[in-house]
Amino acid sequence: MTKKDIVSIVSKERAEEIYGLLTQSNLHSSDIEVIKKNEDYCLKILNEALTHTSFNLSINHERLEFQGDAVLRLAASEYIQSHFPKLSVGDRSALRAQLVSDRWLAKVGYKIGIKTTMLIANKALKDEAATDTICAEGTEALIGALYECLRNIDAIQNWLEPYWNIESEEVLADPHKQNEKSALQEWSQGQGLNKPIYTIKEISKQHGDLKRFYCTVHIQNDFRGEGWGSSRKKAQKEAAKEALKKLTN
């Protein structure tokens, strides 16, 4: 049996593990039935998504992780449109940045126990620092695999909705949790533009000075915003915040 066959041919025991993960993740029973009707194909795709690159096989999760990224963004956009239609463009971008973030993906991965079902090399398993990344990558690949099996964006949205409801409530209750830089980049890429470019200057040498650093942000050479802060990070955050505000005007 070749390495490729390990992923392409799914044993009965492996199939039970995959179905157990889908059930534990609260995927709707009707969607699981759809998968079972095309079982040979779907199990192969799901097993591919659950095979980490560290396992050193030619077929691994990367292709489906890439697909999952696109599916996740679309599903999150439709979720926000449906649940928060009155949010401004800037606030929508800020919220979506959280709903598709690696942090959120890792959180979902932990909750559904994806790491215990993934094929991962022992060395990677022992690397505690890589655990969040592995869970995030696996969850995103699983999203891509489920879409490839179900071909139904509504099914993906319905599956993720309970997890998004919790995250949305936390983010909207605490605006400071939002990542303005990520939100601005989300907006920029959604418009087909380049990533924002931040330019920072140190205005004073005094520690604790709230305007020690000055930052401007440009998107494709267009000035979008400026901000000051006691650190480079805070100045960037303020510049991105101003840019997002301008999008709503």
From Swiss-Prot:
Region (Disordered): 227-249
Domain DRBM: 179-249
Keywords (A to Z) from UniProt: Cytoplasm, Endonuclease, Hydrolase, Magnesium, Metal-binding, mRNA processing, Nuclease, RNA-binding, rRNA processing, rRNA-binding, tRNA processing
GO biological process: mRNA processing; regulation of gene expression; rRNA processing; tRNA processing
Major place of residence: cytoplasm
Catalytic reaction equation(s): Endonucleolytic cleavage to 5'-phosphomonoester
Full protein name: Ribonuclease 3
Lineage of the species this protein comes from: Bacteria, Bacillati, Cyanobacteriota, Cyanophyceae, Synechococcales
Gene name in the database record: rnc
